[in-house]
A protein has these predicted regions:
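C-terminal peripheral helix-coil segments that are non-catalytic and often amphipathic
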Residues: 56, 89-93, 97-105, 123-174
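An amphipathic alpha-helix adjacent to DNA-recognition modules
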Residues: 10-34, 48, 52, 88, ...
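Secondary-structure edge/capping motif, primarily at the C-terminal ends of alpha-helices
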Residues: 36, 40, 65, 69-75, ...
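Hydrophobic alpha-helical connector segments
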Residues: 20, 24, 34-63, 114-121, ...
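Single conserved hydrophobic/aromatic residue that forms the stacking wall/gate
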Residues: 1-9
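Short secondary-structure transition hinges
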Residues: 55-96, 100, 116-118, 146-150
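Short coil/turn helix-boundary motifs
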Residues: 14, 39-43, 61, 75, ...
Length: 174
């Protein structure tokens, strides 16, 4: 027999349903991240693929991202702490490992801290994600660029963010 949404609500609280939805959305994104970061590509090629995947995922799974933003914005919530541990522990490890490997190969500037750079990279990608899905971030994007994110040429967004990331990973102060 098929179950309706009402049956789901009887078995779970609304909070449980939200968390289940967020976990599903994050599993989708994490699979893509793992696939990209496991490749033998150089870090900047991986970064471009991550940026592209973020754009696609943001449009395809906007509801998951909006829900994540809403729940992650709560103050002093056990649920927020649980989500951070569950979601961020995976991506932080994947990014940190990839950056540390690039550092060991000499593909990035030698003075970077892989953990901090992983955090900063994730912040850029998260901000991009929210710019496609959350009203505040959409308005923020429009304020800075003068263009609605939906009207902006996606290749321009990808290219400019990649230049920014590339300079962060390769530019050394002389």
């Amino acid at each position: 027999t098929s179950r309706g949404l009402g049956d789901v609500y009887k078995r779970q609280t609304k909070e449980d349903l939200f968390i289940t939805c967020i976990q599903r959305g994050m599993r989708i994104l994490t699979q893509v991240i793992e696939e990209i970061m496991a490749s033998d590509d150089k870090l900047l090629v991986k970064a471009e693929k991550l940026i592209r995947a973020t754009c696609v995922h943001s449009k395809r799974n906007a509801n998951y991202i909006r829900l994540y933003n809403e729940i992650a914005s709560e103050k002093d919530s056990e649920r927020t702490q649980m989500l951070v541990r569950e979601i961020e522990s995976e991506t932080s490890g994947i990014y940190t490992t990839a950056i540390a490997q690039a550092l060991a190969k000499g593909d990035v500037r030698p003075d970077l801290d892989p953990r901090l750079f992983a955090f900063f990279l994730d912040n850029l990608l998260m901000s991009l994600q929210f710019s496609y899905t959350c009203d505040y971030y959409k308005e923020r994007f429009k304020f800075y660029t003068g263009v609605d994110v939906e009207e902006m040429d996606e290749e321009r967004v990808i290219g400019q963010l990649l230049k920014f990331v590339e300079s962060a990973f390769t530019f050394e102060k002389k």
